[in-house]
């Protein structure tokens, strides 16, 4: 796909900032999971778990993850589903 169709890093970050209530570059892992399941390309639970395993830093004690690293990893090495 063309880059325009896939979106760019800044577009993804702007969308995820909507969930960043503390404005500190983190969001709840559960909110990211919900967004991936409910919005955009429809992914199933197994696909979301694969994304998290491949691209995600561990969540902190309060359940937050740094979303910019997730997007960077996802875009630099896309996960392909059959």
Curated annotation (Swiss-Prot):
InterPro entries: CALM/Myosin/TropC-like (IPR050230), EF-hand-dom_pair (IPR011992), EF_hand_dom (IPR002048). GO terms for cellular component: muscle myosin complex. Residues 7-42 form the EF-hand domain. Gene3D superfamilies: EF-hand. PROSITE patterns: EF_HAND_2. Keywords: Motor protein, Muscle protein, Myosin, Repeat. The keyword Repeat applies. GO terms for molecular function: calcium ion binding. The keyword Repeat applies. Myosin is a hexamer of 2 heavy chains and 4 light chains. This is Myosin light chain alkali. It comes from Drosophila mauritiana. The gene is Mlc1.
């Amino acid at each position: 796909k063309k880059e325009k169709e896939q979106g760019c890093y800044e577009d993804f970050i702007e969308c995820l900032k909507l969930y960043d209530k503390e404005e500190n570059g983190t969001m709840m892992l559960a909110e990211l999971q919900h967004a991936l399941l409910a919005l955009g390309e429809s992914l199933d639970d197994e696909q979301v778990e694969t994304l998290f395993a491949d691209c995600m830093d561990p969540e902190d004690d309060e359940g937050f993850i740094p979303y910019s690293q997730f997007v960077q990893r996802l875009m630099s090495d896309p996960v392909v589903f059959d």
